[in-house]
Amino acid sequence: MVQSRKRFECFEWSKVNFNLRASKYDSVSEPQAELAHGLFDLSLDYLPNTPPVLLELGCGTGHLSFSLAGCFPKMLDCLDISKEMLQICGEKLRDFPSVKWRLFENDAEDFEPDTQYDAIYCSATVQWFKDLPAFLPNAKKWLKPGGIFALGAFGERTLQEMRTAYKEASGRPLSSEATFYSQKKLLSMFEKAGFSLESSAECIYSQGFENPTAALKTLNKMGVTGTGEKPLNRTEVLKLKEALLKTGNEDSAVNFSWELIAMIFRGD
């Protein structure tokens, strides 16, 4: 697999999906790792000078958690719906014996924290929320005065090649449990919840593969398994692979684009 960088169903279904793929997730989740690293770098100027109290929503296997622990926070709370992913995250955090950290197997939209935070981090997660606008006012209450919400999201141009190829192969739009928002839409939702934008960054990350089968297997290992309302038949699968080859270039036979959006919001 080749990568190149250009500039910077429901809750239970998702839980089972990510539990099954936890052990393979780190090996294929380069876009998620890139987004986490970019968000972390963007957020550093907005953290307090004293050791912060941090919350990470949808920590997964700990791409971002490891960097946050490296800040030696006063406390780091990490939350995810997947028990298996939390276990992998916990193994990484054990490299920081002096850091107090806690793991919560919980849906972010139902979480009830027992403390307030200097910063809430949420990277590569909001696409799975059932009702993001309803969640944001609650999250704002979890912040200390002057606290920040650091958001990393996949924009609406994410996986556009896959969606185009699927429509060409099947004649149907590709359905998905995930909702990809534009930066403008995210800004509108956060401002309506009382947040103010401090900083933002955006780029397209290109992920290349040696053949269509490798590309589709990688999406499956990531947990991106939407295949439309009915499965593709054999003929449609062959057409899908042929359509994906149209995305190739001199470096890779198949390419997927990921729109990476990082935004820092102030809670008051």
Give each language-model segment a name.
Residues 28-32, 61-63, 181, 196-268:
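Conserved Class I S-adenosyl-L-methionine
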Residues 30-50:
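Conserved alpha-helix/loop element of class I SAM-dependent methyltransferases that forms part
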Residues 53-110:
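Class I SAM-dependent methyltransferase SAM/SAH-binding core
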Residues 119-132:
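A short SAM/SAH-binding and catalytic strip from SAM-dependent methyltransferases
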Residues 148-210, 225-234:
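Conserved catalytic/acceptor-binding region of the Class I
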